């Protein structure tokens, strides 16, 4: 389907919502999770931004906005909108679905199928996501549709494809060569430092906000090529340098320690998964300031899928059994070592809209509840270089705000039931 037709479909989806002046009465406000915790607070929102935070429940008139709507969240814990740093919004694993169905679909079909995934993600309280791998002809129109207000969904920071070596985790596997040549989009496939520079520049030309690379093998690629380092050291450095020269940062999918450490030495901003992070990895994280995006939920979900899905290809099944038992220990090692941790789920592998399950696993594996909340707000804003706009509830910030009944610092599972969602000052979900 042509880009013009896809764009027309997007424009017909919905009428843009309009931001309005609002006065929020928060029973408890975690304005800067991990730093501030206050009760009986008023948050004033105008033109999509937070204009003030005041003690007490201030009336609309006393806030200087007599016509503003007052939102009663006096029985709720109010927090900044959550951010998920590892999503795949254009698909979702389903054991009941034909795994080859994508070969019959046009880009427009996939775009339309993605709309519920975006809406479910936003309604779960995730107002910003970093999409770490999708066809640029689909994810970029989705991003623009959200920005224009035509699509209900989270703010999208898009990788717009990925970089992988020939035969690497990011390539298609298990199909005839003539089929692969017909459907494979090879702009991100590179071999050698010069070719990998080209790949990074090509993705940026397409519109990538970030560069996603597969530094190691991966679990869900249908090939018995292992989980070790696949992009070589000089290729990693070339990608990071090329991306930096055009103002982009690099996120590296990496499982085995050698690939994690090589990517960190090359200067990537984040490691995705980090399943075998070792002591050297922790030291490199500390030295570089890079972030771990742990994606704990994806692994747990794959183990659950194994119980009901008898059709997982043997190479994938073997890697699931190899990797997942190591994830908890690796996360705990990174946590104990003071590694920067940014929230990320790998939703698409796991169900969209269930992102908050990651919070539960982070706490189950040893993270304090407030630190888990901070990982999805303050820390994610830092990773995205968006602390001027996102991550906290402060005057001048974009009004991305969520609320839950109950105390998430005592029971993290309440984050799985978000009652209130605001993005860009627009209310998408509110208590009955």
What name fits each language-model region?
Residues 76-150, 166-170, 234, 258, ...:
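Metal-associated gating/positioning segment near the N- to mid-region
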Residues 113-139, 152-162, 208-221, 249, ...:
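Divalent metal-dependent hydrolysis catalytic cores, especially in the metallo-beta-lactamase
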Residues 141, 195-292, 322-341, 388:
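Histidine/acidic residue-rich metal-binding segments in metalloenzymes
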Residues 5-16:
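Bacterial N-terminal signal peptides
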Residues 93-97, 139, 169, 221-223, ...:
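Histidine/acidic-residue-rich catalytic or RNA/ligand-binding cores of hydrolases
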Residues 29, 33-79:
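Histidine-rich, glycine-flanked metal-binding segment
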Residues 102, 245, 249, 314-315, ...:
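His/Asp/Glu-enriched, well-ordered alpha-helical/loop segment
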Residues 90-110, 166-185, 219-232, 288-324:
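Active-site gating loops and adjacent loop-to-helix segments of metal-dependent hydrolytic enzymes
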